[in-house]
Each structure stands twice: as structure tokens, then as C-alpha cells.
Amino acid sequence: MAPPAAAPELGSCCICLDAITGAARALPCLHAFCLACIRRWLEGRPTCPLCKAPVQSLIHSVASDECFEEIPVGGGPGADGALEPDAAVIWGEDYDAGPIDLTAADGEASGAGGEAGAADGSEAGGGAGGAEEAGEARGAGAGRAAGAAGGRAGRGADAAQEFIDRVARGPRLPLLPNTPEHGPGAPYLRRVVEWVEGALVGSFAVTARELAAMTDYVMAMLAECGFDDDGLADAMEPLIGEDDAPAFVRSLLFVAARCVTVGPSHLIPQQSAPPGGRGVVFLDTSDSDSEGSEDDSWSESEESSSGLSTSDLTAIDDTETEPETDAEVESRRTRGASGAARARRPAERQYVSTRGRQTPAVQPAPRSLARRPCGRAAAVSAPPSSRSRGGRRDPRLPAAPRAAPAAQARACSPEPREEGRGAGLGVAAGETAGWGAGSEEGRGERRARLLGEAGPPRVQARRRRRTELDRAPTPAPAPAPAPAPISTVIDLTANAPARPADPAPAAAPGPASAGAQIGTPAAAAAVTAAAAAPSVARSSAPSPAVTAAATSTAAAISTRAPTPSPAGRAPAADPRRAGAPALAGAARAEVGRNGNPGRERRPASAMARGDLDPGPESSAQKRRRTEMEVAAWVRESLLGTPRRSSAALAPQPGGRQGPSLAGLLGRCSGGSAWRQ
């Protein structure tokens, strides 16, 4: 028997949710299902899975309008005009108590078999002609037992063969070969495959692969030959053997018949089926008098096939609350608070009409409220609470007016804050001016207003310090001394004495003291003495002669005319041509030699305002100070004139005292030539 063909044009089966295989239609609704699926469904539910209508028969293998097969479901007459006897079980999944005992016979059959055995025994005893009665009795008993055993065996074999023939003739499920994975072709054939495997393992010593191949061969031959015992025996002879093939085939067909049979007793529709099994029922609203008992019985039912109860339907005009009587009002007043609350509850079938009323839609609270502080969450108006019938809405507080930006700035300004509680005032002012204003600002503004307009405490302290610095009175800057044009490089290092710079151009003589002219050794000595005056003043015991000489030399320099600068150079562009910057650079070099670290130097703004503490330097100030130090070092070390070897050595501690400044000045003023 070939496997049933698939019918994809019919769609999918609503039972197995797969493509319909071996299409079968249920009568009278004509819904299509798989033949195996609908038979399994009808085993316990004689109704259509889709419309719940009772199924009378199944139509399958339809070739044309005249060529098809019909399987009666509702206990219809069989081929011989009589009802088929009750079958064993369906699907082969419900008989866990073991195989059916086909050798068991009823009392009448047993009696008949016993009588037949007794007759045979008496005949045998009469034919033997034994003289002794004991021998006759033993012979009669043995003949009776043999006759009973033969009768039971013959009746059992006949019953098994009759069962196989009846299943082969009647409605049954198809026999299918195994799958490529060596599994049963259908779930109901699992018991057949298990029986075949057990029989082969008991007869042959095979491996798992050989057992799977032999089982596939047996199931393929069973699906091809069906219940044809002669053809199946011929197919099994090469595998089982000629002697054992008939018994194996008979047992195989009996097990297969039990698995594919469909018993009519399992398909009889229930007598007391609920109204839900009637399928689709159309409600007739016409005023016809042809209403039978069926309609009356249907109206008594509370539920239809769709689960809708029409007894609960109420007209829209009848949904108003019934007014309470005087007795009910009096009893409600006397029952107290608990009784009143219980009486105000609506009854089981009490309806409230909402016609003509607009119930405000409850707006869900925004998700951002979960991330806001408690103050703001409380300030946001809550959605309207549900009210009972006849009640009033809860009074809503008026919204707080939004403060103007100027008012918010005044409330959060640093003026009213004191030294110890600036952050607290900022938070309070931010909550007062910001959280009740609304939710139009962004997340950054909400965070700033949560901390106050002044920000976190670190930012508040910085702003407060800057405010104090800005409001502090700035002292008037000291007038810078006019730069005196000099032409001598001042070097205050210990090993380099004062030396003249590049040869200065000749200039017209001016009113200078002692008739000294610019460019002469005397003028150079005077300039050197004027430049060395600060260093001499810092010494421990300056001599009066040196002080007088330095003073007279400085006066002589201040009264002379300015020296013209070389061609192509501005007078103030070169730091060596300006007296004040050179002195400042020398002072910085001196401070560095004295051991004062650069980090402890105060910036110019702090030195101008010595009474205020500028606090820690910022990164920009540190970078600016470093740049200034590097520029000063470059001017002093790289841009200066290379030092020349000098005979005058710096005084060593503990050594001989070197020549003094007065001696040098006297030597230069005496007209001696300048020694390199």
C-alpha cells in the first residue's frame, strides 16, 4: 500500500499543523484534515475540530464524483448490513495490560469443547475395549483434556485470523515504512517497530546497524504487501527462513492490525452532547411561529459554542441605577459606617450609565518623575483620582507662579550667603525658585538647580574668592623709573667683571662733569660704578668712598645726552639697552642664586596687591610663569655677549682679598688704558 499523497493546495491540517497528507473530509461540514489525524481525533471526540459539528462519516481517496471511499463514523451499517463487533483498541497506545487473550472462550464454547472432548474420549475408550475400569477412566480423562486443548487452540487461531481479516476489510490506518532515521513512519506504528525489533533480537545475534536495516526491510515489506499474508510470507523467507516465516508473518499481521484498527464503539457520538457541539448556530430574529422544542432547549442553555452568554446582555436604556426605597435608606442609616459602606457597593447586576458624561482620561505620570527629587515630584500635579457616582472631584491646589529670571538670580546670588552656609543657601534657593517653576528646562538645568545656582561647594568657594579679589581696592601702581640708556653689559656674576659692550659711535660732547666724554675709559668706569651701586649697597659694609663715587658717577650719567642707538635697532627693543629690564633680570638671577625656588615667587598681580592672598596658582598662571622664567634665562644666558677671560678673579672665601671697586675706579680715572 503506497503512502498517502500530500495535498498542499488544501492548506495545513488544524490538528497536526502540517501539510495535509491523505486528505479526508468530514461529513456533513466537509472540512479537510489528514486521514490519520482526523481518525485519531474522532477516537474520543466525534465532532469536527473546527465547527464542533458531529461527524457522520469520512470521505477519502477521492478520484472522482463516483470513485471515493467513505468510512462511517456514527455506527453506520457495514458491508454485510450489520454493525461491526467491538474492536480491541485504537492507535496501539492504550493497551498496556498486554495482548488480548484470543484463546479465552465463553462458557458455551467451553462446554461445547468439553462435550466434544468427552464424546471423543468415550469413542476412544469403546474402541480400545479395555477390561479394567481404571484404565477406561484414565483413557477417558486423557481424551477429554486433549479435545479441550485442541478446541481452544483452534478457536484461538480462528479468532486471531478473523480479527486480522476484519481489520483488513474495514476502516484502518495506513501502514507506512520507516523514516530515513530508522523511526516509525507514524506514531501509531511505534508498537509494531518495537515488536519487530524484539523478534529479530530474539532470533538473531546482530549489531545495532544490522538490526536497524532488518527492521526497515520488514516495515517496508509490510507497507507494500499490507495484510496479504501469502505475499508477505514470500517476502520474509529470505530473512526469516522458510520454516519460521508463516508464524512470524501471522504474529506481525496481528500486531499491525491492533495498531491500525479503528473500532466503531470508540466513534459513537455522545448522547448528552453539550450545545457547543452543534457547530455554528444563527440566531433568527424574525417573528416566526415555527419554533420547536429544539429552540426551547437551546434557549435554556447559558452558553453557546463561542462561550457567549446572552442572558447577561442588557439594553442600554435599562442600565440606570434603581432608586433606593425609604426602607433601604432607613436600614442603611442605622447600620453604621461599616454597614453604609457595604450598602453602597453595587449589586451583582447593577449597571451605571455614563451617557452624557465625559470622564477625564487619566494621564499617566511621566517616567522622568522617578529620577526627580521628592520636592519636585510632590510639586507636580497628580492625575485626577477616580470618583464614585455622585461624588465630587478632589480640590486641586493652584499652580505656583513661575519666578522671573531676575528674581531667581537674586535669590541665588552670592551676596546674601554667609561664609559657612553658602552651599545650603544655594540648594534652598534653587529649590524655592526652580522646582516649582515647571519642567520646561533640560536635564543640565535641572541638575544645576538641584545644587543651587552657584553650583557645588568647590565652585562656590572659587567664585567667592574671585569676587573678593575683584572687590578688593587695587593700589595705584608705582611709577616705573625712566630707563637710562647705557651701553655697558651688566653682569653680576661672581667671575665676570663689568666690561664694555660694542664700540659706541661717537657723539657730540655734552655738559658732563669732569670733561668726560662718552666712549672713553673714564665714562665706562663711571657707568660701571653706577651699575654696580646696587650690588655694593647689598654688601655688608660699604665704604664711604665707594658710595660717593657711585653717586657722582650716576649724577654724571643722568645729565648727559642719550646715546643714539645703532642703525637698524630700536632704542627699547634690546633688553640690554634698557636699564630697568636689565636690572629686573639681574635681580631675578640674584634671587635664583640666593636659593629662592621659582614656585615660591609671587606673580605680579599678587605683588601689586600684597595685602591679599591670591591662593593657589591656576594652570594658566603656572604656564605663564614658566614661560617668563625661560625667557629670562634665554636673555641672560643665550642672548648675552660671550664672556671674556679676565685677570681679576672673584674673591674666594678664606683667601686673599681682591682689588676693591675704589681701586678699580681710581685706576681707570688715572688715565690708564683699559686692559682686556
From Swiss-Prot:
Biased composition (Polar residues): 351-361
EC number: 2.3.2.27
Keywords: Activator, DNA-binding, Early protein, Host-virus interaction, Inhibition of host innate immune response by virus, Inhibition of host IRF3 by virus, Inhibition of host mitotic exit by virus, Inhibition of host RLR pathway by virus, Metal-binding, Modulation of host cell cycle by virus, Modulation of host ubiquitin pathway by viral E3 ligase, Modulation of host ubiquitin pathway by virus, Phosphoprotein, Repressor, Transcription, Transcription regulation, Transferase, Ubl conjugation, Ubl conjugation pathway, Viral immunoevasion, Zinc, Zinc-finger
Principal EC category: transferase
Region (Disordered) residue spans: 101-153, 266-517, 555-676
Pfam families: zf-RING_2 (PF13639)
This protein's name: E3 ubiquitin-protein ligase ICP0
